[in-house]
Amino acid sequence: MFAGLPSLSHEQQQKAVERI
């Protein structure tokens, strides 16, 4: 997953995961 994007909040990460 995105373990190198700490700048993204949990909400943003979830949205990104949904996109993929």
Swiss-Prot record:
Q: Which family does it belong to?
A: Belongs to the UPF0181 family.
Q: Identify the stretch annotated as signal peptide in this record.
A: none
Q: What is the protein name for this chain?
A: UPF0181 protein YoaH
| Chain residue ranges for the region called Disordered | 1-20
Protein encoded by which gene: yoaH
Going by the entry's taxonomy, the superkingdom of the source organism is recorded as: Bacteria
Specify the species. Klebsiella aerogenes (Enterobacter aerogenes)
